[in-house]
C-alpha cells in the first residue's frame, strides 16, 4: 500500500474509529482491562462465567520462576526444560517426554547468536510470564454471553501469550509445537522468541481490542434490503501485493472456525502465518471457542513483530521489514492507543469430493447465502462511516477448504456491496486470474449490475455438466450477454 493511499486513509480516520469506540459502546459489554486516556479500567458486575480465561498463573509456585532467574546463566537448556515440566506438573522423570522442537531451536540459535544470548531469550520469556499476576486482572471474561469485546495493553497480551508456554492444555498452549520434529515448529519458536525479545527490550505502548461481531439473520436482511440496489463497490485487484503489507484498513484472516487454525500445531498457511507475525492475535484463541455462522472476530491494533518467507512446509521466520511493518506506525494510533488496522477472521465452508462436487456444493443457494452472509458480517464489523476504507482480502477458503476462486471473488464483491466498502483483492501472483477478475468488474460496470442483482445471477446460473475453474465467470458472462441480445 503506497504512501499516498496511506495518507488518504489516515485523513479519513480523523472522524471514524474501529469498534469498540469507547465513547459510544456499553462499557459493561466492552471490557477494558487496561487504562486508556480518559477511560479507566472497566468495573463490571457480571459474575465470572465458567468459561472465563483460566487464571493458572495465580496458582503457580512463583518460587520456581525466582529460582530459575537466579541461576539460568549456568543451568543451560536442561534447567529451562526442567522448569517447564515442573510448571506442567510432571515432577517425576518417568512422566516427562521429549521436546525436540525446543531442543533444536536452542541448538540452532546457539550456533547463530551464542548460547548466552539464547539463555537470555529464555529468561526474558520467564520474566514476562512471572509478571502475569501484576499486570493481569483477577477476572478475564471470554467473548460469550453479554461480553462483546476485550481490550488489553500490549504488555498484558505478552503475559497471556507467555503463559501459553507454561500451560499443558494443547488447545490453548504451545506444548504441541514444542513436541514437533519439523522445521516449521522450530521456525514458529523463532517468531515467538522474537516477539518476547521485543516485548522485553522495547515494547510498543498501546492497546489491542478483540471483539466478537454477532448479527441476527434479521439484521443481515435489513442491511441487504438497504443496499441490494446499490451499484457494486469499487474493486482493485493486485497480483503482487499481499494482505499483510497494508495498513489503515480491514485485513481479512482466512480463518478456521476454531480461531488460529493450526497455529498451535503444525499449520503454516495464511491464518497461521498472520498469527505468527502478530502473536498478540493469539489472545483471541483464549477468548473464543468455535465461531458460529452469524459471527466474525475483529482484532484492532495488533503489532507486527516479524516478517516471513515461504509458505506451509517452507515457512521461514524473517526479521521485520518495512514491507510488513506499515501498520506499526505510531502516528496511526487512535485516541484509545490502538493501531488503526483491523484484522477480521471469517471462516469459510469446507468442501470435499471431486472438483466438480466441490463447485456444485458451493453453488447451492444455502451455501452461497451462507458465504455471502459470513463475509458481510466480517466486512460490516467496523460500523458506519467506513465507505472509503478498504477491505483487503484474497482467496478466502480456496486452499485446504477447496473453494472456487472466481466464485469466492464474487462473493466478497457482493459482501463489500452490502457493507458499502471498497475491496482491494490480492491474487497472490495469479496474474491471469487477476486479469479475469478485472474483466468481470468491467462487464458489471458496463451493464450497471447491482449488488443484489449479482447474487441473483450467480444463484440462477445452474450447475455445470463438467468441471471448469472458470465456469462461474463464463456462465455469468453468457447470461449477461444473452439479456442484451
From Swiss-Prot:
Expression sites (tissue/organ): Expressed in head and tail neurons.
Highest taxon of the lineage: Eukaryota
Single GO MF annotation: poly(ADP-ribose) glycohydrolase activity
Record flagged with keyword Cytoplasm: yes
Keywords for the protein's UniProt record, in alphabetical order: Cytoplasm, DNA damage, Hydrolase
Observed effect of gene inactivation: RNAi-mediated knockdown results in increased sensitivity to gamma irradiation.
Main location: cytoplasm
Localization (cell): Cytoplasm
UniProt GO BP: ATP generation from poly-ADP-D-ribose; carbohydrate metabolic process; DNA damage response; nucleotide-sugar metabolic process; regulation of DNA repair; response to gamma radiation
E.C. designation(s): 3.2.1.143
Tagged with keyword Hydrolase: yes
Pfam families with a match to the protein in the record: PARG_cat_C, PARG_cat_N
GO CC list: cytoplasm; nucleus
Consequence when changing residue 271 to N: No poly(ADP-ribose) glycohydrolase activity in vitro
Catalytic activity: [(1''->2')-ADP-alpha-D-ribose](n) + H2O = [(1''->2')-ADP-alpha-D-ribose](n-1) + ADP-D-ribose
Function: Poly(ADP-ribose) synthesized after DNA damage is only present transiently and is rapidly degraded by poly(ADP-ribose) glycohydrolase. Poly(ADP-ribose) metabolism may be required for maintenance of the normal function of neuronal cells.
PANTHER family recorded: POLY ADP-RIBOSE GLYCOHYDROLASE, POLY(ADP-RIBOSE) GLYCOHYDROLASE
Stated family: Belongs to the poly(ADP-ribose) glycohydrolase family.
Protein name: Poly(ADP-ribose) glycohydrolase 2
Lineage: Eukaryota, Metazoa, Ecdysozoa, Nematoda, Chromadorea
Gene designation: parg-2
Amino acid at each position: 500500500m503506497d504512501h499516498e493511499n496511506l495518507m488518504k486513509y489516515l485523513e479519513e480516520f480523523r472522524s471514524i474509529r474501529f469498534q469498540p469506540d469507547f465513547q459510544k459502546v456499553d462499557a459493561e459489554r466492552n471490557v477494558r482491562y487496561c487504562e486508556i486516556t480518559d477511560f479507566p479500567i472497566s468495573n463490571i458486575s457480571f459474575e465470572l462465567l465458567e468459561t472465563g480465561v483460566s487464571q493458572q498463573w495465580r496458582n503457580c509456585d512463583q518460587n520456581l520462576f525466582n529460582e530459575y532467574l537466579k541461576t539460568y546463566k549456568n543451568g543451560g537448556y536442561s534447567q529451562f526444560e526442567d522448569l517447564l515440566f515442573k510448571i506442567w506438573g510432571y515432577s517425576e522423570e518417568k512422566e516427562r517426554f521429549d521436546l525436540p522442537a525446543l531442543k533444536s531451536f536452542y541448538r540452532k540459535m546457539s550456533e547463530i547468536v551464542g548460547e548466552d544470548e539464547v539463555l537470555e531469550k529464555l529468561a526474558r520469556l520467564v520474566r514476562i510470564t512471572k509478571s502475569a499476576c501484576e499486570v493481569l486482572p483477577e477476572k478475564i471474561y471470554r467473548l460469550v454471553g453479554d461480553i462483546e469485546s476485550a481490550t488489553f495493553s500490549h504488555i498484558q497480551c505478552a503475559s497471556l501469550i507467555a503463559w501459553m508456554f507454561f500451560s499443558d492444555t494443547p488447545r490453548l498452549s504451545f506444548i504441541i509445537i514444542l513436541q514437533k520434529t519439523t522445521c516449521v515448529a522450530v521456525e514458529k519458536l523463532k517468531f515467538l522468541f522474537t516477539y518476547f525479545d521485543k516485548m522485553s527490550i522495547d515494547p510498543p505502548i498501546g492497546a489491542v481490542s478483540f471483539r466478537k461481531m454477532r448479527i441476527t439473520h434479521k439484521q443481515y436482511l435489513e442491511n441487504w434490503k438497504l443496499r441490494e440496489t446499490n451499484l457494486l463497490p469499487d474493486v482493485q485487484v493486485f497480483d503482487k501485493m499481499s494482505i499483510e503489507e497494508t495498513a489503515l484498513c480491514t485485513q481479512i484472516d482466512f480463518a478456521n472456525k476454531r480461531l488460529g487454525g493450526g497455529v498451535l500445531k503444525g499449520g503454516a498457511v495464511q491464518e497461521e502465518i498472520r498469527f505468527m507475525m502478530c502473536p498478540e492475535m493469539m489472545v483471541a484463541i483464549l477468548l473464543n471457542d468455535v465461531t458460529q455462522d452469524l459471527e466474525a472476530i475483529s482484532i484492532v491494533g495488533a503489532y507486527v513483530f516479524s516478517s516471513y518467507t515461504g509458505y506451509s512446509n517452507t515457512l521461514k521466520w524473517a526479521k521485520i521489514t518495512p514491507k510488513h511493518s506499515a501498520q506499526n506506525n505510531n502516528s496511526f494510533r487512535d485516541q484509545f492507543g490502538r493501531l488503526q488496522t483491523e484484522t477480521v477472521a471469517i471462516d469459510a465452508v469446507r468442501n470435499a469430493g471431486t472438483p466438480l462436487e466441490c463447485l456444485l456444493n458451493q453453488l447451492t443457494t444455502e451455501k452461497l447465502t451462507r458465504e455471502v452472509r459470513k463475509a458481510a458480517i466480517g466486512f460490516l464489523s467496523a460500523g458506519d462511516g467506513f465507505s472509503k476504507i478498504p477491505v483487503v482480502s484474497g482467496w478466502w477458503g480456496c486452499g485446504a477448504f477447496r473453494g472456487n476462486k472466481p466464485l469466492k471473488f464474487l462473493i466478497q464483491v457482493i459482501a463489500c456491496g452490502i457493507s458499502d466498502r471498497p475491496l482491494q483483492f490480492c491474487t497472490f501472483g495469479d496474474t491471469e486470474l487477476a486479469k479475469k477478475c478485472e474483466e468481470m468488474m468491467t462487464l458489471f460496470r458496463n451493464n450497471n449490475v447491482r449488488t443484489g442483482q449479482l447474487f441473483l445471477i450467480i444463484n440462477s446460473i445452474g450447475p455445470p455438466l463438467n468441471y471448469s475453474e472458470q465456469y462461474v465467470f463464463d456462465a455469468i458472462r453468457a447470461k449477461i450477454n444473452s439479456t442484451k441480445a
